[in-house]
Amino acid sequence: MDAFQSILKFFLNQKTAIGYSFMALLTVGSERLFSLVAFKCPCSVENTAYGLVFLFAPAWVLLILGFFLNNKAWRLFTGCCMNPKKIFPRRRCCRFFYVLGHIILSSLVAPVMWLSVALLNGTFYECAMSGTRSTRLLEMICKGKPKECWEELHKVSCGKSSMAAMESEEVRLSLQAQSQILGWCLICSASFLSLLTTCYARCRSKVSYLQLSFWKTYAQREKEQLENKLLECANKLSERNLKCFFENKKPDPFPMPSFGAWEAASELHSFHQDREHYSTLHKVVDDGMEQTPQEEETTMILVGTAQSL
């Protein structure tokens, strides 16, 4: 039992890495499925459009899904049309762009994975480049090749070119090599950017490493208990209302947070150095509806916590 609990604790502690690993495997599987089942290069002048659509359209869809599934985005934008001060509060206009940048970076993970895998495979890029009409690109691809390469490059990816089989294969391998080089460049650039943003966020942190660890633990526990409490209160309220409806009697008072409390607890957390609140809910409970001076607050985002609800 102790061994099982240790293993379970390890996986819970590494759930972010496990989640990204699962996303990577899912991306690889999806790309292979697209390549084998759905992708059929037309071997015509439409190669470029067809290849680029298969390369970038899934990445765009994944980006949109990333926004849809990011609870922090909905927490930021819910009610903003009715009250623009929610996203552009007084003296903290930059806060919106800071949070939005974090949301965009989080949503870019899946699209970058797709583009990296697709470029490393090379199928979509090969089809797209074989349909190019750019003189500069044709000079680069068909350098040292017969004139058939210029005229029938769009047929190379299907093996229908009148060029010698060896020369046609050389062109295909060259296009695949270019695709893989771009794929590795994208992976290296994304990894370096991720490292830079993480280092910058840690260097700008207003709390120590141990306090940050405590903050993460607290926020995770609050998230779990909040979900349970919401379900429990919803069950009790619905049970009370149904019972009173069918028994035709007046309901007993049911204590619930006020509208203002719901609004305050739904805001993104702003860390205050003098008053250590580890979440917006923590701040609302301690201060009630009293607002902390805006100019003394520092926006800090804790990834994967109750702030993502």
From Swiss-Prot:
Pfam families: Ca_hom_mod (PF14798)
Disulfide bonds: 41-127, 43-158, 142-149
Subcellular location: Membrane
InterPro entries associated with the record: CALHM (IPR029569)
Topology Extracellular: residue spans: 38-45, 130-174
Binding site for a 1,2-diacyl-sn-glycero-3-phosphate: 32, 37, 121, 202
GO CC terms in record: membrane
Cytoplasmic face of the membrane: 1-15, 71-99, 201-309
Main location: membrane
Regions that span the bilayer: 16-37, 46-70, 100-129, 175-200
Keyword NAD: no
Lineage top rank: taxon: Eukaryota
Biological processes per GO annotation: ATP export; monoatomic ion transmembrane transport
Keyword Nucleus applies: no
Membrane topology field: Multi-pass membrane protein
Function of the molecule: May assemble to form large pore channels with gating and ion conductance likely regulated by membrane lipids.
Subunit and partners: Oligomerizes to form undecameric cone-shaped channels.
Similarity section: Belongs to the CALHM family.
Protein name from the UniProt record: Calcium homeostasis modulator protein 5
Source organism of this protein record: Mus musculus (Mouse)
Protein encoded by which gene: Calhm5
